[in-house]
């Protein structure tokens, strides 16, 4: 007991010296903007809709002079036409939150990386992998939800082929100072079908070697 009592007294003294009026910790400005929360099958009131199922008006083909040859479907989805080229948004982006839904073909062909392979590239540089990873083993840093080659997903939350799957992704772009020197890496938080699979992971290098210091577009891959 003679060792415990002095320790308690010291702790009490330190606490009393650090005591702060709770009101001094209150921050009133800036006040967060009010938005309408999303309802089931809804979207936040300030969201930018990149695809409404009717046209590709906010997208371009990577083959700059070519029209987009992907299919528009009756259920207001789009389908990649292999070999026609990737598409990207007309608008460039910095740090964003993205909700995207996707599914892989019901008819299974191939295995590993040859099953519904695609990717979502943020700023055309950093890839979140899209793949049929349901009972389909491949290298862990290349399965669905991987930050391609760099970060393995925490778990495999994949659904069977033909089922709609969801990614909710928070992308924080890397930061540069006025001299163009990187001062902070970019990062990803990824939820796959509501399950956290990437928890603030740091991006050490781009999937595609492009200038990281400038904004760029969102890119959907045609893997062929």
Name what the model sees in each region.
Residues 1-17:
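Bacterial Sec-dependent N-terminal signal peptides
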């Amino acid at each position: 007991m003679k060792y415990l009592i002095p320790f308690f007294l010291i702790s009490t003294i330190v606490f009393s010296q650090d005591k702060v009026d709770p009101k001094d910790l209150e921050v009133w400005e800036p006040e967060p903007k009010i938005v309408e929360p999303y309802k089931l099958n809804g979207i936040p009131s300030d969201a930018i809709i990149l695809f409404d199922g009717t046209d590709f008006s906010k997208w371009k083909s990577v083959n700059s002079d070519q029209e987009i040859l992907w299919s528009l479907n009756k259920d207001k989805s789009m389908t990649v036409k292999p070999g026609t080229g990737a598409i990207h948004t007309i608008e460039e982006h910095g740090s964003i939150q993205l909700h995207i839904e996707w599914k892989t073909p019901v008819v299974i062909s191939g295995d590993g990386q040859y099953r519904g392979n695609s990717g979502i590239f943020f700023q055309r540089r950093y890839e979140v992998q899209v793949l049929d990873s349901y009972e389909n083993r491949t290298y862990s840093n290349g399965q669905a939800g991987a930050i391609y080659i760099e970060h393995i997903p925490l778990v495999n939350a994949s659904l069977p082929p033909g089922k709609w799957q969801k990614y909710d992704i928070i992308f924080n772009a890397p930061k540069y100072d006025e001299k163009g020197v990187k001062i902070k890496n970019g990062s990803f938080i990824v939820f796959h079908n509501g399950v956290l699979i990437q928890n603030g992971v740091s991006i050490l290098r781009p999937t595609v070697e492009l200038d990281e210091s400038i904004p760029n577009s969102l890119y959907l891959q045609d893997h062929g």
